[in-house]
Amino acid sequence: MLSAIPAAHMEFYENLQNYYVMAPYLCVHAGIHPQKSLQEQTEAELFWIRNKFIYSSHPLPYTILFGHTPQTDAFFDLPYKIGLDTGLVYGNKLTCLETEERILYQITRGKNTIKQIPIHEKWESSPRLTMP
């Protein structure tokens, strides 16, 4: 089965990082350990952490964009984090965030209509995330 995957694709996947910095955002799968620097984060924390991250603030200079923990809707705890896993696998919806325009895009499982949800007002009380 692996032999069917082109070598260039395998090289791409093998060189992926565990997180992606897109200032002022940090994109991770699950979250971060709230008491550690970015360099101290373990792979297990970036891929599996839940409650310790979700129920805490953190000192990093980023808003963390994360998934892994399904919610019924996008989760905002600004300026610290935005949860984008809205439970598609459980029959809910798929959500993504366009960071520059600050618009959520959502599509409900089994439907073919994409909702655009402006979320500019979420940033109004977060000085770290003011619009340019």
Regions found by a protein language model. Give the residues of each.
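A short C-terminal boundary segment appended to hydrolase-like catalytic domains
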Residues: 124-132
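Acidic, His/Gly-enriched loop-helix segments that form or flank divalent-metal centers
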Residues: 1-94, 99-115, 119-121
